[in-house]
């Protein structure tokens, strides 16, 4: 079997109208990741509807429609291969969904591609673009590439490209602590295919990489195998003749059969008999592996979704209270002391109370602008103290980043996002 390419999770971010989904579609289409049979079917339909010459946008619309109708399209649709990587695209259609996904780590991205419309040079950087980039920074995404898109609408002008590049560099990237000299700015026209996978003949002045080549310049993620074991539990099954089988994704550390494990905040422990991935037994599980593991000495009723598995010598931290840095994404009024929304951290969902508002920060620079603010509103960044209403595991983001991030939800929407920067552990 050929050695598998390393997986790279790439988030596509930017304003909704910058052509993100077209860029993603073009990447998938030109790198042959869309199922050929589906393409044939769509081509035929395009011809029947008099759209001969096979409109790319038509394919994208149909993929979108198929998604909306709930028809599962070949999963290849969200993955494609470059020379170096198997790339998984974390493309988030809805702005708020995107933010929640990015923060809860469900789709912890290794790198991001910021897609902007070259025409924004005239109007200024879109607020949503700023917010996405700030979040990418807050979440520790260090590697980014920029696609300056819709170049076809400015006649592939180098001057317009340079204007946009300068504006992004000075007003956004440098402010957030990125070094523009280490970032590829690729002039693209996704609808036409320029510089996404295929090199454009319309911009001979551009000598840099295509978007796909820029992805290959990213560094692969280090697997956090040296950190303590943490497996947030997604489900627990009781299988006849086998016993209790918790299921989850290994976030950090290594799990092997024979290991003694402890589940928190449940406070129960047992011994691992076997580990399965994709219905095959494996000798050890590493970060990124979605596994089921059979545990002796634990019953199904002892543990549940939201518990975290670790080794007894370094068990998951159950928080009495914690200090967090948050960004308020949307709140109809204001957040004050006593507010108790639901925190989504790894697989846990626990109501937590704001017990102190310590500092208000400038969301663009992180500088303190007010000590002990009375309230927080949409757009504010802050440092706050939080008390869970019932036991939950959360880790200091500086020690185990994979379990240090969370989203805050209330009234059916994501109110805020953040990370734990100090955790006071519960005394046993």
UniProtKB/Swiss-Prot annotation:
Positions with a binding annotation for Mg(2+): 21
Region (G2) residue spans: 70-74
GO molecular function terms attached to this record: GTP binding; GTPase activity; translation elongation factor activity
Region feature G1, mapped onto this chain: 14-21
Region (G5), start-end ranges: 189-191
UniProt-annotated stretches for the region G3: 91-94
Recorded GO CC terms: cytoplasm
Localization (cell): Cytoplasm
UniProt family annotation: Belongs to the TRAFAC class translation factor GTPase superfamily. Classic translation factor GTPase family. EF-Tu/EF-1A subfamily.
Function: GTP hydrolase that promotes the GTP-dependent binding of aminoacyl-tRNA to the A-site of ribosomes during protein biosynthesis.
Protein name (database record): Elongation factor 1-alpha
Provenance organism: Methanocaldococcus jannaschii (strain ATCC 43067 / DSM 2661 / JAL-1 / JCM 10045 / NBRC 100440) (Methanococcus jannaschii)
Source lineage: Archaea, Methanobacteriati, Methanobacteriota, Methanomada group, Methanococci
Encoding gene per record: tuf
């Amino acid at each position: 079997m050929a050695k598998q390419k390393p997986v790279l999770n790439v988030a596509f971010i930017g304003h909704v109208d910058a052509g993100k989904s077209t860029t993603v579609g073009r990447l998938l289409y030109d790198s042959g990741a869309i199922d050929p049979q589906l393409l044939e079917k769509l081509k035929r339909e395009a011809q029947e509807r008099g759209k001969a010459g096979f409109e790319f946008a038509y394919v994208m619309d149909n993929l979108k429609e198929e998604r909306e109708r709930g028809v599962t399209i070949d999963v290849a649709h969200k993955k494609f291969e470059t020379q170096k990587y198997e790339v998984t695209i974390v493309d988030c259609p809805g702005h708020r969904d995107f933010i929640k996904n990015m923060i809860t780590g469900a789709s912890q991205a290794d790198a991001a591609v910021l897609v902007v419309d070259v025409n924004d040079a005239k109007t200024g950087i879109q607020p949503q673009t700023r917010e996405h980039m700030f979040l990418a920074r807050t979440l520790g995404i260090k590697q980014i590439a920029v696609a300056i898109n819709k170049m076809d609408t400015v006649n592939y002008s180098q001057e317009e490209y340079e204007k946009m590049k300068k504006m992004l560099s000075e007003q956004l990237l440098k402010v957030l602590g990125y070094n523009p000299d280490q970032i590829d700015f690729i002039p693209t026209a996704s609808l036409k295919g320029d510089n996404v996978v295929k090199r454009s003949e319309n911009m001979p002045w551009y000598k840099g990489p295509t978007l796909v080549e820029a992805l290959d310049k990213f560094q692969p993620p280090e697997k956090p195998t040296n950190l303590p074991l943490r497996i947030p539990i997604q489900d627990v099954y009781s299988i006849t003749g086998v016993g209790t089988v918790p299921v989850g994704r290994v976030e950090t550390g290594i799990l092997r059969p024979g290991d003694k494990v402890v589940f928190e905040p449940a406070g129960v422990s047992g011994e691992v008999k076997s580990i399965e991935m994709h219905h095959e037994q494996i000798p050890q599980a590493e970060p990124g592996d979605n596994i089921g593991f059979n545990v002796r000495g634990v019953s199904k009723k002892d543990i549940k979704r939201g518990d975290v598995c670790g080794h007894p010598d370094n068990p998951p931290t159950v928080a009495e209270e914690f200090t967090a840095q948050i960004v308020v994404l949307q709140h109809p009024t204001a957040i004050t002391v006593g507010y108790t929304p639901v925190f989504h951290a790894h697989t846990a969902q626990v109501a937590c109370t704001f017990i102190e508002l310590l500092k208000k920060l400038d969301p663009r620079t992180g500088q303190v602008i007010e000590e002990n603010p009375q309230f927080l509103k949409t757009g504010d960044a802050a440092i706050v103290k939080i008390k869970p209403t019932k036991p939950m595991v959360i880790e200091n983001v500086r020690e185990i980043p994979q379990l240090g991030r969370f989203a805050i939800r209330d009234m059916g929407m994501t109110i805020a996002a953040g990370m734990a920067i100090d955790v006071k552990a519960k005394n046993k």
